[in-house]
Amino acid sequence: MSDSVLVYSTDVGRIKEEKASVVRPKGDGVVRIQKQTSGRKGAGVSVITGLDLSDEELKKLAAELKKRCGCGGAVKNGIIEIQGEKRDLLKQLLEQKGFKVKLSGG
């Protein structure tokens, strides 16, 4: 019954629900860059996983990478997606920031 919503309480004042914090699994310290085309009608996307950053830091990093690559992208569930096959450039940019990077997948 942990998913139940409070219906009645004798407490005085407004009762606020606690916000559930997003918990991501800890990685092994290696950032992986994959090429994905499945479900994208053949368009290639570079997917960056393994970054142990907060949501705001991920958004800032994604914005900088998109600007440096000159393309679009998105942040979804702790994963950065950059449009196009820019794996080599992304690897170079992330290594300059001090991340340990591996190219994985196709």
Swiss-Prot record:
Keywords: Protein biosynthesis, Translation regulation. One of its GO terms (biological process) is formation of translation preinitiation complex. Transmembrane segments: none annotated. GO terms for molecular function: translation initiation factor activity. InterPro entries: DENR/SUI1_TIF, SUI1, SUI1_arc_bac, SUI1_dom_sf. The keyword Transcription regulation does not apply. Belongs to the SUI1 family. This is Uncharacterized protein HI_1225. It comes from Haemophilus influenzae (strain ATCC 51907 / DSM 11121 / KW20 / Rd). The lineage of its organism: Bacteria, Pseudomonadati, Pseudomonadota, Gammaproteobacteria, Pasteurellales.
